[in-house]
Amino acid sequence: SQLTLTVIPEHHLLKLGGGSFSTTLGGFVLRGEAAYYNGKYFRSTDPLIEDGVVEKDYFHYLIGVDSTFWNIKTSVQFIEQKIQDYDEQIVNDENEDTVTILLSRDFLRETLRLELFSYIGLNDNGALIRPKISYDLTDGFQILAGFNIFNGETGRFGQYDHNDMFYTKVKYSF
């Protein structure tokens, strides 16, 4: 006997509402945003649930601060996603917390930029670390190189731990 599997993609309407703010406080920029999502589908481990997904609302927010120290542009954000009316069989954690850190500095009259951007998953101690260097050869012509370095055992970043990558880019703008 032959088993046939039919997959039918389905896209669900997702309603959301939110807002953002940004203000200066001394030498700092404080900013934030929040959104409430109505009707998002999350994967479930419950074999009795049709299609293996369950519909839940969730709240997503971030708070961040930007500043410059010793000519190093610095940005730090805390991000949280909280699933409402949580069910233990949902694959995602009820609260998913992430910190992002961006450090960048320009050299050679702002033609050379060194940058380090990191996502740090607080739930599973995984991370994505993205060092990058870019150089403006002339106006409109830029070269850059960087890495995507995944770290962790499991989770959003750790699942890609053996998939680090190096990339290069040549960009011409006119």
Positions of PLM-derived features:
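Repeated loop/turn-to-beta-strand initiation elements of outer-membrane beta-barrel proteins
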Residues: 27-31, 71-76, 109-114, 140-145
